[in-house]
Amino acid sequence: MASSSLTSKSILGSTKLGSSSLPSELRRLSSPAVQISLRTQTRKNFQIQATGSSYGTHFRVSTFGESHGGGVGCIIDGCPPRIPLTESDLQFDLDRRRPGQSRITTPRKETDTCRISSGVSEGMTTGTPIHVFVPNTDQRGLDYSEMSVAYRPSHADATYDMKYGVRSVQGGGRSSARETIGRVAPGALAKKILKQFAGTEILAYVSQVHHVVLPEELVDHENLTLEQIENNIVRCPNPEYAEKMIAAIDAVRTKGNSVGGVVTCIVRNAPRGLGTPVFDKLEAELAKACMSLPATKGFEFGSGFAGTFLTGLEHNDEFYTDENGRIRTRTNRSGGIQGGISNGEIINMRVAFKPTSTIGRKQNTVTRDKVETEMIARGRHDPCVVPRAVPMVEAMVALVLVDQLMAQYAQCHLFPINPELQEPLQIEQPQNATAL
């Protein structure tokens, strides 16, 4: 039987077609009495949003820029109006994140001075998109000449090529930690909103560098202060362990090597009721946000993996009513989250960061053309990322919480329930609190 070759044509309209309505190629193959059913062709419109560069639903942040481009920054959409905001409010956390602040960070020198160009009028947010920009001023593109050909082991060089077929060689482009400027700036704003609303405090600190592990019982999470954390260059609140951590970083820094570590983050006075079952549980959102940071390799909250060694009786947090009539838990192995919803206790989590992949030691690798070779990476890189990761973790936690807070108001506060079940555990509002 001879084969037929039919051209592809768009047939729009009814799916029931008589032979007279068919294209000539089909008419020759059919009898007049035959009705042929065809699936109508529908034009599909695809909407693509800066894939992978945005986070949040109600308080939405989109970051842009590359390590060795003209600059980096973000657009914040959904910020409530009438929030007092100046560039200095954002600059404090950007300074904590910036490179070149001590001998245990990258020697790249950037002031990371931010500029707000929209969304703020006379020191108050207007409710419209806020644009924040930080220029790059200390690029050294020639440091990456070898990396334009060969891939750095355990870096995103290879996977960016595999996915896109092209990559920004200088500084790693979007995979560079410099992208996190666009997270830390809106994170500072999110912390400000949370503080004004409920006195919520978010504090992160370094709890481990390589083999130096700070015992949790040495940190009083109820009374921990930012001053204790910022008292040393490694951002560990315990001076004795801080010195040990600095020594561990110095030991590998002088040899062109690197080490990893852990950042612990706590949230005090978190509003109750944040988080939505079942796929948008609060701990799931926190994990996603924190694990999106560069170099992260692990996340746990509450008792974490250690909880697997306990029985149910040992692990359960028993309830009681405190002197103010509030429902509390005597222990906090749940980490302030139960059933994916915040219960008002201190939220605590730990984020693991791998050793910096770009090191000044000889390593085996391959080129883009699959030729095996050796590489000694040049450039300026952190011997350990965790001291600078502290404000990054705080920022991501703040972005999650402020987005969840706005979602809570959108869903559950149209017809409010007993307010005592949802108010933060803090009895008095901070003096500078304003209604949002």
Curated annotation (Swiss-Prot):
Transmembrane segments annotated in the record for this chain: none
Presence of keyword ATP-binding: no
InterPro entries, sorted: Chorismate_synth, Chorismate_synth_AroC_sf, Chorismate_synthase_CS
Annotated pathway: Metabolic intermediate biosynthesis; chorismate biosynthesis; chorismate from D-erythrose 4-phosphate and phosphoenolpyruvate: step 7/7
Keyword set, alphabetical order: Amino-acid biosynthesis, Aromatic amino acid biosynthesis, Chloroplast, Lyase, Plastid, Transit peptide
GO biological process: amino acid biosynthetic process; aromatic amino acid family biosynthetic process; chorismate biosynthetic process
A UniProt-annotated Pfam family: Chorismate_synt
Cofactor: FMNH2
Superkingdom of source: Eukaryota
Listed name of the protein: Chorismate synthase, chloroplastic
Organism per entry: Arabidopsis thaliana
High-level lineage: Eukaryota, Viridiplantae, Streptophyta, Embryophyta, Tracheophyta
